[in-house]
Amino acid sequence: MSDRQIKGILGTKLGMTQVFDDQNRVVPVTVVQAGPNVVTQIRTPEKDGYSAVQLAFGAIDPRKVNKPRTGHFTKAGVTPRRHVVELRTADAGEYEVGQEVTAEVFEAGTVVDVVGTSKGKGFAGTMKRHGFRGQGASHGTQAVHRKPGSIGGCATPGRVFKGMRMSGRMGSDRVTTQNLKVHRVEGESGLLLIKGAIPGPKGGLVLVKSPAKGGA
């Protein structure tokens, strides 16, 4: 079992803006409405085989919550929430069920990973989806300007290889942007100003957590 202490919080992406640092340099930041989250369950090695903390976020009409999940929130002594995430962390025992987690779990200068769902683009061709060059614009090319070209041989190998890059649905994928720096924490308003861009549209759900690799 890992002995790493992982911090994290669910929030909503509000959009991007720019602020100034101490040297009056422009810093592009993404504003995240972080939390408040509430602890709904503590996992322990003795009972569950691993150590983790479960966080819940977002209001939801109780009538839209099924009975098993309603019972789970009732047991924790909190009102039902829309989103739930579990973080494996060695210090899960320091949390308490019902405890509130706010943006102040992070400090300015902290390096974080941000997990979100990328914007859905719908069905896209190979030029947009994979950056293919396409066919010639002239010299006898007819009605195939944006087509991918050959996808394999004929008798040999007699099939299309797995993983062939082709047209299909693009976007709406789970994306993690690693090692972003928290530029500022607005404790009273629950805002995190994270340097750089993060995945997803405005209003999208994001998870801000301790970095999986590196970080300072």
Swiss-Prot record:
Q: Which domain of life is it from?
A: Bacteria
Q: Which residues cross the membrane?
A: none
**A GO molecular-function term, please?**
rRNA binding
Q: Where is the signal peptide?
A: none
Where does the record place the region Disordered? 132-157
Please name the InterPro entries in this protein's record. Answer: Ribosomal_uL3 (IPR000597), Ribosomal_uL3_bac/org-type (IPR019927), Ribosomal_uL3_CS (IPR019926), Transl_B-barrel_sf (IPR009000)
Task: Spell out the Pfam families in the cross-references.
Answer: Ribosomal_L3
Q: Detail the disulphide connectivity of this chain as listed in its UniProt entry.
A: none
Cite a single GO BP annotation. translation
Swiss-Prot/TrEMBL keywords: Ribonucleoprotein, Ribosomal protein, RNA-binding, rRNA-binding
Query: Per the similarity annotation, which family is this?
Result: Belongs to the universal ribosomal protein uL3 family.
Tell me the function of this protein: One of the primary rRNA binding proteins, it binds directly near the 3'-end of the 23S rRNA, where it nucleates assembly of the 50S subunit.
Q: What is this protein called?
A: Large ribosomal subunit protein uL3
Source organism: Saccharopolyspora erythraea (strain ATCC 11635 / DSM 40517 / JCM 4748 / NBRC 13426 / NCIMB 8594 / NRRL 2338)
